[in-house]
Every structure is written in C-alpha cells, then in structure tokens.
C-alpha cells in the first residue's frame, strides 16, 4: 500500500532573527540565559516539549534563550559505517528551530577534540565559562562528555560549583510509547509516514538539490526529478504520493524510492514524477 511522503526541494532558509553561532563565542546579550542541549534530530514533539519549557523559563526571568546542538550527529561521528541516519538535514533543523523564535543557536563541531572533553570539562568550559548559562534544559536520557559518562546526575552534582540550575524534561509519550528520534527513524524505515507526521507535528520532508539524470524517463513519457538521499534515513522502498516544493513552484507528484528499478541502476534515489 502506498503511504504519503512529503519531499520538499527548496532553497529558502527560515532562520530569520535567530543568531547562529558556529563557535561558542557568544555576544554579551546572549550570555547568562536559558539553554537547551541536544541533537534535536527531527525536532519532534518530545524536543518541542523541551524547547517550550525552556522558553517559558526564559520569558519568566526575562533572559535570552538558546539551543546547543552538535554537527555531525555524534552517532555518525563515532560510527563511520552509519551513512543514512538523519531525520532532518542541518538546514532543516535550523529552520525548524527558528520557528520557535529562539534567540540563538550554537552548533558545536563534534570532532576529536570535543569528544575528548570529560563531563566536568564540558560543564566548566561550555556551560560556565563560554555561555554562563543560568538554567539548563535537557531530556531525561541526556548523556555527554568523554565516553558518554556524563548524565543528569552529573549535571545536578556541579550546579553550585558552576552556578547554574539544571531542569530535566520528562519524556513525552504517545500511546504509552516514548517519542524519540530512534523510534521515528524506525518508523521511517517501515514507511509509516502518517504516524511520523503526527510525532513531528508536521509533514516529514526530504530536502536537497535536484541532480541531473540521464533523461531516459522523459523519453518514455515519465519525466522525473531525481534527488539523492545523502545522509537521510532511508524510508521503506516503494512508491509514495508526494508534494514537491521548488524555488518557484509547489506541486503534487508520485515518488519512487529505490535503485532505479526500470534500468537496473545501483544508486539509491528518490525519483519524482511531478504532475502538471
């Protein structure tokens, strides 16, 4: 049975007034505020709960509010064999976070130097010295520091020493199941797109550049636009009804995710026939 996938192909960015830092050198107006930390892959309902709780705290105390996230996603950094893992691209993540009207986004380069920081070093350097965070929001299963030895207990332990308060967001559940990026990735591989859309509170989409095909489809009456999946998690192979957004158009179509089934190709592609 066909499920609905929503691939979006467009260039615009929605970051707007959200300041993006690619290092941790914050301007004075963004220091000493409320910070939420996490991968935020998918920016799903669970993430949205963390963001909204942190945002309320910032408003209540008249403080700046920002998010710290990591690039690449640590799982992909530690295991180079994992190629297809993301729910959203980094650009999509920025755009989704910007919709919450946060003041700033810090994208930490997750590299060998950063991974070697102990949990206390992370708290001292990032939370205390660089951002001077007053209120820190994380989810219940947050792990950090070298070998992921840091936990919410570690955050609580160092609160007084480094002058912050950590607040733990309880997992959000739907149908008695925890909403997580891991569970959403699994549903994507199963092709359960409508379920995913409910957990994201929006239509899941794939964003990328159209790649030049061999135009063989055009010759047999089925012109297609091809999109590489890059490091997106691979949906269940098959045919989906889609909406396609380009720089100057928004149309419906039919997409096939597979290995060029007509011509025995080896590249995994999202091939879309756009109506009209």
Where are these regions (language model features)?
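Classical nucleotidyltransferase
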Residues: 116-223
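N-terminal catalytic cores of NTP/NDP-binding nucleotidyl/phosphoryl-transfer enzymes
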Residues: 25-84, 89
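Short acidic-hydrophobic, aromatic-tinged amphipathic segments that line or gate anion-handling sites
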Residues: 19-25, 106
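N-terminal amphipathic/basic-hydrophobic helices that include classical n-h-c signal peptides
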Residues: 1-17
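Active-site-proximal cofactor/substrate-binding loop regions of enzyme domains
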Residues: 67-79, 84-127
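Residue-level signal for inorganic ion chemistry
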Residues: 44, 97, 136, 196, ...
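Phosphate/ribose-recognition catalytic cores of enzymes acting on nucleotide-derived substrates
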Residues: 211-276
């Amino acid at each position: 049975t066909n499920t609905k996938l929503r691939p979006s192909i467009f260039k615009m960015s929605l970051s707007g007034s959200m300041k993006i830092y690619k290092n941790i050198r914050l301007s004075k107006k963004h220091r000493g505020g409320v910070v939420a930390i996490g991968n935020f892959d998918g920016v799903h309902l669970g993430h949205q709960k963390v963001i909204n709780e942190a945002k309320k705290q910032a408003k209540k105390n008249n403080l700046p509010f920002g998010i710290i996230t990591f690039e690449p996603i640590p799982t992909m950094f530690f295991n180079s064999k994992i190629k297809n893992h993301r729910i959203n691209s980094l650009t999509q993540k920025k755009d989704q976070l910007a919709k919450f009207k946060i003041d700033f986004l810090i994208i930490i380069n997750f590299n060998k130097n950063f991974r070697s920081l102990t949990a206390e070093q992370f708290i001292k350097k990032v939370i205390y010295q660089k951002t001077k965070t007053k209120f820190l929001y994380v989810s219940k299963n947050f792990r950090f520091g070298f070998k992921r030895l840091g936990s919410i207990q570690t955050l609580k332990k160092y609160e007084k020493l480094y002058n912050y308060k950590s607040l733990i967001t309880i997992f959000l559940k739907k149908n008695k199941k925890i909403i997580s990026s891991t569970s959403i990735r699994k549903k994507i591989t199963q092709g359960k797109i409508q379920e995913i859309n409910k957990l994201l509170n929006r239509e899941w989409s794939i964003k990328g550049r159209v790649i030049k095909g061999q135009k063989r489809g055009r010759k047999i009456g089925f012109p297609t636009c091809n999109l590489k999946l890059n490091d997106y998690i691979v949906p269940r192979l098959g045919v989906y009804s889609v909406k396609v957004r380009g720089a100057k158009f928004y149309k419906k179509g039919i997409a096939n995710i597979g290995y060029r089934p007509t011509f025995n190709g080896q590249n995994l592609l999202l091939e879309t026939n756009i109506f009209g």
